[in-house]
Curated annotation (Swiss-Prot):
Gene3D superfamilies reported for this sequence: Ankyrin repeat-containing domain
Keyword Repeat recorded: yes
Name of this protein: Putative ankyrin repeat protein L88
Signal peptide: none
Swiss-Prot/TrEMBL ANK repeat ranges: 22-62, 63-96, 100-133, 137-170, 174-207, 211-241, 245-278, 282-313, 317-347, 351-384, 387-420, 424-463, 470-499, 506-542, 546-578, 674-704, 708-738
Family matches, as PANTHER family: ANKYRIN REPEAT CONTAINING (PTHR24173), SOCS BOX DOMAIN-CONTAINING PROTEIN (PTHR24173:SF83)
Amino acid sequence: MATVGEYDVDGEFPCYTYEYSKGFTKLMYLIITEKNNPNGHKNIVSYLSDKKNVKSINQKNKKGYTALSIAVRNCGNWCSYKTVRILLEKGAKTNIKNNEGITPLIFASFNSRFCEGFNVINLLLKYGADINARDNNGYTALMNASSNSNSSSTYTTVKLLLDNDANIDDKDKNGLTCLMHACNNVTLKSSIGTIELLLYYGADINAVDNNGRTALMHACDNSNNIELIELLLNRGADIEAVDYKGLTCLMIASKYAGSINSVEVVEILINRGANIEARNEKLRTPLMYACKYSHNNTSVIKLLLDKGANIETTDLRNNTALILASTYSSSVEPIKLLLDKGANINHTNDEGCNALNLACINSSYNNNSEIVKLLIDRGSNINNMDSERTILTSTCEFIGKGSNIDTVKILLDNNADPNIPNTNGNTTLLYMCKKYIKDGPKKRDLNFNVIKLLLDYKANPNFINKKNENSLTRLSKYSDKVDIEIIKLLLDYGVDINSTNNYCNSALLLFCMDLQNSCTKISYNCKNIVKLLLEKGADVNIINSNGNTALSIICESDDNNLSDIIELLLAHNANPNTINKEEYTPLMHLIERFDYFLTNSKSIPQNIESDSDSDSMSGFESYRGFSQSSKSVNKYNLDKIEKNKNEPEINYRQKNLEMLLKHKTTKINFQNSSGITALLHECQVSDNIEPIKLLLDNGADPNIQDEKGETALHKAVRHTNKIDVIKLLMDYHANPYIFRNKGQDLLSYAFKKSSRRNFVNIAKNLINNPCHVLSDENRSQIFESKDKENIISIIKMLEYNAKIKAKFDVTIDLMPQIATQIIYNHKSLRARLLKLKWLYMCGDIDKIITLENFELFDYLCVENMYQLHDKIIGISDHI
């Protein structure tokens, strides 16, 4: 009886014991509750007496069941045969399928043992049920009956369907026939009698399914029923039939060598002439299948060997039966048997693996280290190398997958050599260093223990691979993923801390490189490792192939918070004066990063206040020995930088720079091969006054010349956009009168190289400083002189350059700033009179009394110095 509540149109009710559905009609409800009520069938008859109710007799519920499907499925259990009959009489359709494609006839055939099946099936067939209808899997009523003839269905049902012309060789979606279904289930749900019946009615004994398998193959695969095998063979089953993978019946039977009666089945097939050396598409024989799948049952293996199976036959990949057994078996017994029968223990397959190789890398899957021990005891080559690596390395490779640390220990205990390199030049230890990184944190402890085990068994931490790496440099290459414990372990076992790779990078250099752009967490880890390496004696001055030391790498970093590392490196005697291949010193790197930050920081002022219109340049006065300008150098003080959110980073970078500048071994005026100092470099690339002032405050010499003869002033006038940088250099006693190698002084060099605006500012500040022209041949050159000829010299330069069309605009800008009464031609009367005045004021009598000036004396009507004095005073207001 179905245990259900009262009928509810929206309720959920059972279609049969294990399947519930919504959408039940009142008729469906009356059917499943028929035997709950003594008048159950009468209620159904009464309900169907109403023509209105009959109209909905074929209505489906949500699972696709009709009232007839439910009645047939539960006939004899919840309802009666009489109910099935009245439904058919009232017009219930026999071929309506539920959502799984099952018709009432299929239900009846499957369940005929419990539902008055013979009578129900006859009744359904009488009312036009399609005997060959298929469900969604392609199963027919005959297939269901044949599969279950010894359980839910019956032999009689199968015969009834066959007598009513059911198609005996129809196939389901997988290509299985009724005979195949019966053979698959003969041990449990079907019977030999059913198979004999199907064969009697003409079932095709050698029909094949979608995989090319026959009924005999299915029998060998699933039943292991000796009587069935003999029946099929006696009825003409093809013993040498081959499925689409090339498997024969003997291979299939050998594959299930651990099953009941498997030995007898194999023996029957062999005795009936099955080819014991047949091969499938992988060239595997029945013996190979028996070895691969037998596990602890060796009977079939022994039988095949006794029947003459070749123990050394190889498959497509050159695997032998021993290799397959060592790879897949969970028992040592098949391996023992094969070895006792003379199997070659050191045969290798196409990948170079012997039986021990494969036993080791699969030791975790089978949880059996006894196979490994047996193969070693029987003389397997423990140091065999496959196409790439040794057995020990392969075992370590599969740690956490197919192998385990116990297997590694067994190998090491039996003298496996951890120092044999693989084809890439890496030993087992070097391989594990990479695996330690690759596997990540989840397997870190496991890999750490394996590395320690290898070191305990004399693995050489200083073995050098083809990339010139030892274990420490190999790990350090992945410095962002390394923790300090593994580094400590290698150091404890004597790894060479200063070994370098092909790029001349030591572990210290590699970790410093990682600090350049690492995140906070990684940076913290790398810092600790750097400190450890220094404590353990790492050479702080190793130079890599780019010419960088640890200090220069750190100084080039974008990370502002590396003061402690810089301090630590310097404390360990890092050389701050090295030059890399880019001709940079650590100081140059550090000041350039500081300058870069200042330039790109939005909150740093881009223009420091300056007085570019000043008529004086205090640097010239200072250099000449005159009194300092009233404008103090402190106007350039870094304290003027307004406080902002970037101030902490500015302070960090400034601190790093000052630390290096103040270190006792730092040569602030150190020159590279091109003669460039940190100050020259900064003046050449920067518009920021702060880093330049830091250098000058710490003793940078502004008058050092590079290989071109250029000083900081030369660099500044050419590259900077700010007159303040030039003025700052002058305030720190930069000499504006130093010549370049090509004979150019500062002003003429500025005129040639600097921007128009800068040249105007430079020239304006030189007007009141003593200069003169060297010669008529080099009119644009201005040099220091005791003579007060600066205005004339400037005019001469302007007059000369005004002839150059491209520079005429500069002349136009400067000329209004010169006294308007001075004419352009220096040989004119006014120019000569002005020169005479200046010579007199300087007291240069020798230069006044010349033949050239006699014409002027005559013009002025003077005969002595007193008259000349009066005349000069008189004409001062007119020239």
